[in-house]
């Protein structure tokens, strides 16, 4: 609580009130009694008075002195060339004074004086450093100049030696040429001398035969001597030429070696000069440069000159792995021992070295910038201290060439496998991963990119491994030691829709399959194996509707024999021709079954003629295709058909390995709500067991359950046996090859590769709106789109329905399949339909309760179909409603102009007679002059007498004016017409 009067303030200060009153009076504060009040101003005046009376000032409290120390290092070489590191400590003292209005000027003056003292010391130190640095730079410049002069002298000497060698070579060549010319001249003289002797010989022989016989030995002897002399001269010439060439080659090699040595010296001098220039351009504080390799021991004088400069500290012996001394250990060792270091002094331990040396050095000054401390002395070592614990920096070790391996990195690899490929410990790989910020274990999987980065970090060469090719795996599977055994034939039943394929198969299987198909037509591939008295046959029943072309092609691809079913009362139809084409393309033999022979209007002969026209010739006509007349209703001819099928199978000699990994074909695939992805597989070779890891396209997984065509569980399936498997990661595409893989990792690797490879194809099938499509739409004008989402029960039906709907697209209306998949209609499908304004088509599927509720809330249209005809027809009708209506002109009447009136503010008005039909007020009109159309427009007014009328019929007169047209002449004709819109259909 603040004191308000003199008595309270005296009690607070613990002094008598009378003494306080006296002090207040002395300070100029007039207070009469102890009860008088005191203000803050009175207290401040009292405080100032007491300070002045006691002689105390606040000058010391207003001044702060700061002392700053800065330690730096410089390197200096003495006269012997030893490099020394000198520590420089700069102490700066600065005083800050708190100024007020009265003493501002005095404070400034004192501050300047204090700073001036410090600045003088700093200035002197900087001048000394600058002078020292200038001396060093001048010394280095002189050294550089001397070295350049020496190089120039060496270059001049080399050129002189080359000129002398060249002159010697030319002189030798000239001498050899002179000798060669002299020898040739002597040979010519001998030849000329021999010619007269030969010419005179016949005459002498005729006159004196005895003398000629006596002279023959002398001539022969002379010619032999001449030949020997010429051979000796040629040998001497060759020897002289060879000596001249050897001398020239030796001179050239010597000159080249000298030139290379001079070039090396020049390059070293230029590098040193460039380094000096760079350091001269660097800031003054950046004095510690990355150490450079020490000079060769063969040049001690130059090494001494190169050491001990401000900008070039010498490098320790063990730091430069690429220095020349590393190649010659015997020469490097003396250099290391004979060059004393800058700080070498006798240690207390003498020559014992070891830990005492290290402790002594630690107690010394640790210079941060001195990376060398001498030529061959590191931080820990010294020439005297080579004991039991000598430092590695002072011990020469022969460099070992690191082994760089080429590591093939697959898509995924564990840490242990990667370390094994590089021949390093797994801990090294884990350390590298930790440096990159990832904590991994020894069994953790790494992706290819991360693994390649690790390989490069550890100094090896990483190569992306060639991805596993499923075709290569198939080839490897074929090269198997398993014995090939006979297998059942795979028979595909093909033909036109409603020709009785399924009924025929139904009779063979003794099961009512056709009754279960919607509309009585097959919309899936059915795979069954039937045990007959003659053997096992696997049947594939394919759809005959035109929409299922791809499904039929898959059936022909997997089959051995095709049964072509043709109705005897219908003949060859479009899908019959297509089935024949599929069978021929696959090189599959045909067995023709002429069905429905029990009908009254059956005509098998006509069917045979039509098939012959298609290239299918019966055996009775000299062909190779057996024709069997059957009736699926009565069972007539069924046994003959099976017998022909098995006969064809025996001819083909169908075999497959049984004790081998299975491979096959996906016949059909679907998404079951309780089972997940389900695929119908036809095993083509090997044996498929429950628990095997299978790969089907981009789907993979372990076979969790396996059912036969009757729905009964089975543990294994051999060749030509169809089974339904569960456990795949996703619904595979129908027609994909199925391969049994050795393990999950390999299967996942190939599946991920295929997913990445075919991602673009998948996106293209979804037909997302992209820039190209937008540009197409802009070029084509207004194009209407019908977005659809197609969900089907199986993959083949969904594929066939999508293809059929896409065929409905025209230039004006296009079908856009936003999404197509297998399975029930879910909430995500409804949300997608809401965003894309699409219609959902469910083919043999239904929406769950949540999806139906969401569709009702968002107004999404869901259509259900179980026959492909109905889906295609309704979409076609909806697309017809989206077409722009067609405009048609209907001529309603003809008018003849009898008279033309000019009306102010209106223009020309034609007095007309309706000669045919009628004229309406809202009609359009064409003006004909001499039967040529000169104008087309609309009526502006239609009057009869003075009244506006809506219609004037034939035989009546009227007045007409045309909008924006006044060039009306008597005798013109008006053709009156109306434009109507007519709905279009696809």
From Swiss-Prot:
Query: Where is there biased composition of kind Gly residues?
Result: 371-384
Annotated Low complexity bias: 183-222, 320-342
Signal peptide (UniProt feature, chain positions): none
**Which GO molecular-function terms appear in the entry?**
GTP binding; GTPase activity; translation initiation factor activity
Q: Which InterPro entries match?
A: DNA-bd_dom_put_sf, EF-G-like_DII, IF2_assoc_dom_bac, IF2_II, IF2_N, P-loop_NTPase, Small_GTP-bd, T_Tr_GTP-bd_dom
One Pfam family assigned to this protein is IF-2
All copies of the tr-type G domain together span 486-655
Q: Which residues form a coiled coil?
A: none
Q: Basic and acidic residues: which segments have biased composition? A: 122-182, 228-277
Q: Which UniProt keywords apply?
A: Cytoplasm, GTP-binding, Initiation factor, Nucleotide-binding, Protein biosynthesis
Q: Where is this region: G5?
A: 631-633
Region entry G3: which residue ranges?
Answer: 541-544
Q: What family is reported?
A: Belongs to the TRAFAC class translation factor GTPase superfamily. Classic translation factor GTPase family. IF-2 subfamily.
As for what it does, the entry says: One of the essential components for the initiation of protein synthesis. Protects formylmethionyl-tRNA from spontaneous hydrolysis and promotes its binding to the 30S ribosomal subunits. Also involved in the hydrolysis of GTP during the formation of the 70S ribosomal complex.
What protein name is recorded for this chain? Translation initiation factor IF-2
Organism phylogeny: Bacteria, Pseudomonadati, Pseudomonadota, Betaproteobacteria, Burkholderiales
